[in-house]
């Protein structure tokens, strides 16, 4: 009798999407953006997760200042005329049966003062996103925010580039 009750409870949990085997880290790995140069699609720009709201858990990881970031990171060199492409999953699998949709993506430039300046992202027909780099040479740090399921799931990443002459 107890076995039947246990099997029934586990079955209900699986069917309702409350899988005992749900793995937040595995689910969030699906959100890691692929960031490349339009002129050189094989050149990847590394993004680091800085925080998330996932399945009711909220974590704000350390977001370095631009000065700390530039000191510690090796940046990809980019031409002033290049564009950067961002590719993310439009649907993320949650547990065994549920998928959540990407419904917002925002990009901000992190200024030396620590303030954020919104950057226009353009969505292309093939599902990729693009943005143009600043015309002034220098090192730039960005924060990318992805929102899924009307903001129930959010993940932030930071990355940087160096604009050359």
Identify the meaning behind each predicted range:
Residues 25-74:
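Transition segment at domain starts
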Residues 81-83, 137-141:
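Extracellular Ig-like/FN3 beta-sandwich strand-entry sites
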Residues 1-5:
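Positively charged n-region of N-terminal signal peptides that target proteins for export
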Residues 125, 132-139:
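Surface-exposed, short loops/turns at beta-strand junctions within beta-sandwich domains
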Residues 148-156:
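Short acidic/polar inter-strand loop motif in beta-rich domains
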Residues 119-125:
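Short beta-strand segments within Ig-like beta-sandwich modules, predominantly Fibronectin type-III
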Residues 16-17:
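C-terminal motif of bacterial Sec signal peptides marking the signal peptidase cleavage site
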Residues 53-116:
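Mature extracytoplasmic domains of secretory-pathway proteins
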